[in-house]
Structure formats: structure tokens, C-alpha cells
């Protein structure tokens, strides 16, 4: 890329940075005064004319200044040399806050609240997807001789409790055998494989009485737990930030709120996140959803080095602090993965 192209990108970078900070259209005189561009105001005006002709900036109404277009934001994000990381104190505060979560639900609630505060946007966290989870532990507890409590714990920290009503009473020895058989069938397996294993076990021990009946009833309840679609659950925080930024959205605020409530668009975008640590920025039309006009989403996956638990990110107007938002999303995702992976 030639020096003129590089110079024009520096002009674009300055326009994006100033517009994000001030919300005001940016003129050539302002750019020369605020930034060390090393050229005259006339040269900057010429560069802005080229950027406008190429679709990177536009003139709103009768203002003499210019604002970035979605194409301009895209170029700015694609050419971010580096994203300033959060300070050590900020990272430590995030880690301590998330580690204080008592269980999966609490950790995710803390994460979404924290991310909304850090970015001043709408924060979204997807519950761990079942397809990537492994059964870490199964507990079978007798509430009465004919009533059991099944507790399934996955490696992502998800805890599911189910009641099993037996057709007949079982004694302590039979309870121990039932716990052992179900544990051998489930523990250490991905949930998809575990559901097959428990169904096979029920088929092998099919019997109207004795332990076969207990296994069959337990299997029916466990299958409900193992195939339940928790990946369709989202946590959101900071929706009040939408109204604070209402003037920045190019489309209808109502349509954005409806899209968030329906969750379909958001789930589709989060489902595309398959690599922990990789942050994706979708600007305006790139969300491929009419309801999301004028919005950007910064998303990533969270999990361990070898397992993705789910997706997370923020939604806000295209006039967004992209470097700061990317850094915050990446940091919170990393610590969610560490906290859940250590449990």
C-alpha cells in the first residue's frame, strides 16, 4: 500500500477515534489540531474527499464534518495493530470477581454483569452447550426407599437435579448397585454418548420388577437431563445501555429489543464461535439481520484449551469503542473458561 493510502488510513483512524469519543462529525481543521498527521489541512481535506468517494466516511445532513460508515469501521477494526490489554489490576479484579461465584449460574451472572459494566453495552453469555460437555459426576440419593434424587454434574459446572419415582422400594445394596451401574455408563462421556449409554443400559436390564425397573425409570429421567437444550439459554445484562445509546442506532430500538428477546439471531451469531480466544467483530449489515441495523456485535467463545463451552459477547451501536470492547470481551471470556475449567 502506497504512502498516500497509508496517510488516508491514518486520517480514517483519527476520524473513527474522534467520532467514537465525541459523537460529533469531524472536520479537517479539527483533525489537524488534534492529531499529528504531518500534513496540511488542505491535504487532509483531499484525503477525506477520497475516503468519502470510496465509502469509508460520509457527511451527515448539512454538517461540514464527516462520520465513519460501516465500511469505515470495518477497515478500522481490520487494521487494529494491537488491542491494548487490560491492566494487571483490572485482570486481577475480573478473576477475583468471577472466582467468587458459587456455581455455574452465579459465575455467568457475574460475567454478564461485569461485561456490561466494562463496555457500557448489552452483554450476552450463552449457557454451556451440551454438545461439548462431559459428565463429571453422577450422584444418586435416596429421598425415600421409592424416591430418588439424581444429580448430574458436567465438566462445565452445570448441575442438573431430577426426581425419580420408583415402582417399588429398593434397599441400600440395590441403591449402591444402581449408582455404580449408572456411573459407569455416564461418567467421563460426552453428553451425547452418555445418553446413548444410559438408554442401552436400560434396554439390557429391561425388567418389570427389581433393579431393572429402577434402571429403566432412572434412565428415562436422566435422558431428559442429558438431551435438554441448555444451549438455548442466554443471560443478558446492561439492556438499559440501549436507551442510553439510543441516538447512535441507525434502526429502530424496538426491533433490536425484539431481536434480543427472541434470541434467534443472537444464538446464531454465538453458535458461530468455535474457538476460545478468537474475537469476532460483526459490524452493521454483517450481522445479516434486519432487526440489527445500526448495531455491532463483538463475540468470542469461552472454555478450556480443548473444549468450547459456549459463546459470549456484547451488542451495541456501530459507534463503539472497538479496541476497549475487544479487550474486555477477550479478558472476561478467558477468566470464565479458567474458573469453570478449574471446578
Swiss-Prot record:
Alphabetized InterPro entries for the sequence: GAF-like_dom_sf, HrcA, HrcA_C, WH-like_DNA-bd_sf, WH_DNA-bd_sf, WHTH_transcript_rep_HrcA_IDD
Top-rank taxon: Bacteria
SUPFAM superfamilies (UniProt xref): GAF domain-like, Winged helix' DNA-binding domain
Covalent S-S links between cysteines: none
Keywords for this protein: Repressor, Stress response, Transcription, Transcription regulation
An individual GO BP term: negative regulation of DNA-templated transcription
Coiled-coil regions listed: none
Gene3D superfamilies: 3.30.450.40, Heat-inducible transcription repressor hrca homolog, domain 3, Winged helix-like DNA-binding domain superfamily/Winged helix DNA-binding domain
GO molecular function: DNA binding
Functional note: Negative regulator of class I heat shock genes (grpE-dnaK-dnaJ and groELS operons). Prevents heat-shock induction of these operons.
Protein family membership: Belongs to the HrcA family.
Name assigned to this protein: Heat-inducible transcription repressor HrcA
Amino acid at each position: 500500500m502506497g504512502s498516500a493510502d497509508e496517510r488516508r488510513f491514518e486520517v480514517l483512524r483519527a476520524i473513527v477515534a474522534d467520532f467514537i469519543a465525541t459523537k460529533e462529525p469531524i472536520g479537517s481543521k479539527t483533525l489537524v489540531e488534534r492529531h499529528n498527521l504531518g500534513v496540511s489541512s488542505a491535504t487532509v481535506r483531499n484525503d477525506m474527499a477520497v475516503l468519502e468517494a470510496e465509502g469509508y466516511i460520509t457527511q451527515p445532513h448539512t454538517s461540514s464534518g464527516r462520520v465513519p460508515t460501516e465500511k469505515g469501521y470495518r477497515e478500522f477494526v481490520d487494521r487494529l495493530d494491537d488491542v491494548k490489554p487490560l491492566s494487571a489490576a483490572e485482570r486481577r479484579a475480573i478473576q477475583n470477581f468471577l472466582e467468587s461465584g458459587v456455581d455455574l449460574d452465579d459465575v455467568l451472572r457475574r460475567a454478564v454483569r461485569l461485561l456490561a459494566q466494562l463496555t457500557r453495552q448489552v452483554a450476552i453469555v450463552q449457557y454451556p452447550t451440551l454438545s461439548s460437555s462431559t459428565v463429571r459426576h453422577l450422584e444418586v440419593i435416596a429421598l425415600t426407599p421409592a424416591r430418588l434424587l439424581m444429580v448430574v454434574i458436567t465438566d462445565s459446572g452445570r448441575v442438573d437435579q431430577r426426581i425419580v419415582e420408583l415402582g417399588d422400594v429398593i434397599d441400600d445394596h440395590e441403591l449402591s448397585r444402581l449408582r455404580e451401574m449408572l456411573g459407569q455408563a455416564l461418567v467421563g462421556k460426552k453428553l451425547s454418548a452418555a445418553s446413548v449409554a444410559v438408554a442401552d443400559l436400560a434396554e439390557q436390564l429391561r425388567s418389570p420388577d427389581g433393579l431393572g425397573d429402577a434402571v429403566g425409570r432412572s434412565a428415562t429421567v436422566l435422558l431428559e437431563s442429558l438431551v435438554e437444550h441448555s444451549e438455548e439459554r442466554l443471560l443478558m445484562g446492561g439492556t438499559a445501555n440501549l436507551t442510553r445509546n439510543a441516538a447512535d442506532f441507525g434502526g429502530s430500538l424496538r426491533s433490536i429489543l425484539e431481536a434480543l428477546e427472541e434470541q434467534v439471531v443472537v444464538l446464531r451469531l454465538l453458535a458461530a464461535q468455535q474457538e476460545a480466544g478468537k474475537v469476532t467483530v460483526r459490524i452493521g449489515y454483517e450481522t445479516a439481520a434486519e432487526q440489527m441495523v445500526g448495531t455491532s456485535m463483538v463475540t468470542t467463545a469461552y472454555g478450556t484449551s480443548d473444549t468450547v463451552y459456549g459463546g459470549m459477547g456484547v451488542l451495541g451501536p456501530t459507534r463503539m469503542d472497538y479496541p476497549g470492547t475487544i479487550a474486555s470481551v477477550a479478558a472476561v471470556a478467558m477468566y470464565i473458561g479458567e474458573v469453570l475449567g478449574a471446578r
